[in-house]
């Protein structure tokens, strides 16, 4: 697993805190949510944030 940059983790955590119902374990849905909730213009950064959020949601689902 790759190490994520700090800004990816910070923004992902902020999005999860503010909009927990906007995200789930589906990457494509999370990608659309990141696009609508942020002003990130870079496709690569958007995908990294969506991937991080997806991973966090999947981990939370396994614990529950």
Swiss-Prot record:
The keyword Ribosomal protein applies. Keywords: Ribonucleoprotein, Ribosomal protein. InterPro entries: Ribosomal_eS17, Ribosomal_eS17_sf. Pfam families: Ribosomal_S17e. GO terms for cellular component: ribonucleoprotein complex; ribosome. It comes from the Archaea. GO terms for molecular function: structural constituent of ribosome. One of its GO terms (biological process) is translation. SUPFAM superfamilies: Rps17e-like. PANTHER family: 40S RIBOSOMAL PROTEIN S17. Belongs to the eukaryotic ribosomal protein eS17 family. This is Small ribosomal subunit protein eS17. The lineage of its organism: Archaea, Methanobacteriati, Methanobacteriota, Stenosarchaea group, Halobacteria.
């Amino acid at each position: 697993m790759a190490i994520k940059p700090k800004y990816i983790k910070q923004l992902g955590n902020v999005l999860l805190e503010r909009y927990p119902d906007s995200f789930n374990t589906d990457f494509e849905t999370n990608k659309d949510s990141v696009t609508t909730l942020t002003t990130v213009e870079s496709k690569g950064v958007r995908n990294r944030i969506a991937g991080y959020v997806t991973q966090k949601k999947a981990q939370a689902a396994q614990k529950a």
